[in-house]
From Swiss-Prot:
InterPro entries: Ribosomal_uL15, Ribosomal_uL15/eL18, Ribosomal_uL15/eL18_sf, Ribosomal_uL15_bac-type, Ribosomal_uL15_CS. Pfam families: Ribosomal_L27A (PF00828). The gene is rplO. GO terms for biological process: translation. This is Large ribosomal subunit protein uL15. It comes from Neisseria meningitidis serogroup A / serotype 4A (strain DSM 15465 / Z2491).
Amino acid sequence: MFLNTIQPAVGATHAGRRVGRGIGSGLGKTGGRGHKGQKSRSGGFHKVGFEGGQMPLQRRLPKRGFKSLTASANAQLRLSELESIAVNEIDILVLKQAGLIASTVSNVKVIAFGEISKAVALKGIKVTKGARAAIEAVGGKIEM
C-alpha cells in the first residue's frame, strides 16, 4: 500500500451539490435559496449575533465579574492534608511534590480544618491563628 494509491471506500464520498444548473436538476434557478430577501443575494449574510438592528443578546446582558490573576498563585491547605505527608519538614516544594498544590502556586496558607496528630515543621508557609494553635499543640513549629 502506498499513500498515492489510497482511496475512500465505495459509497463513502458523495458528489457536491451542483446548484443553478437548470430546472431538471432540482436545484436550478434559485439554487435552493428561495425567492428574494437578504439571504438569497450573494454576500447577503450578516455577522454572528446580528439580530436585525435589535440590541444583540451579548450587549443586552450585563457584564459580570473578572478573572483574578492572583487566584492561581494562592492556595489554602487543611490541617488534615498535612497529616498525609510523610515528611516532617514541610515547605512549598514538598507540597508540590506531594500533589497537594498546583505547580503555579507561590503562596500557601494552612487553615484550621480537620485534625492533626503529628508534629510538623512548616517553612515559608502562612497559617491562621487556629491552625497555628493546633500545630503547636501537637509539638509542631512554624518558621517564616
